[in-house]
């Protein structure tokens, strides 16, 4: 019973951390997205360093031998997370948060093609509900919704970028069969941060990073902390709960983002709530494996 209580508490913490992460990133919108992504991931990996104190040495060494998966996946993630950070800098957090879950639609396609998973009627229905939910994130009549989606570069960027998030997630599925998930999580964050840092150096965007560290260090640290420890909370949660409970419940972070965006960023979220509900419901149907 104690393990279940701890797991449930960790799950609630994960939902809060995921929801607040987007708010911290939104507050860094004035800086270049590439260098902010670099700082975001490197800071996140820094906050994950304590996990190495509890990882057995033999497990750590085995994980280090298979880091090519993390290198490939983190390189792919750079495209998806750049879209994520860039979209947050240009649009409301309460809009981008549910669109982030569009990666589950891409993941369904990739899982069927490369992992041999069955589609199932519930997953098809979930995909349809998510698709409909996208339109309800925008106000107006159906023709106006189409126009606003087409005109919103940030929305299209996030939907397109979510493909790379799904592709990276597919590689992760193969990788964690042989690599300790904690070592892998740190490696993904660290390598992604290095990739972004390399791009920032090449494009001469580092000055913006120094400016961000000088003026918004607290926000950067909070963003990195929420990024790294949201995953640790997931590991604790699935130690006492089924993954099919922990993963769908994590989608509720969309509503945490919406609440915090309303409270701190003064975003108008009321017209988006129904769309959020539809997208979360559809995403849950995609994630939960129902034997039909």
What is the predicted function of each stretch?
Residues 43-47, 99-113, 191-195, 230, ...:
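Alpha-helical transmembrane segments of compact multi-pass small-molecule transporters, enriched
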Residues 66-74, 117-131, 180-192:
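Alpha-helical transmembrane segments
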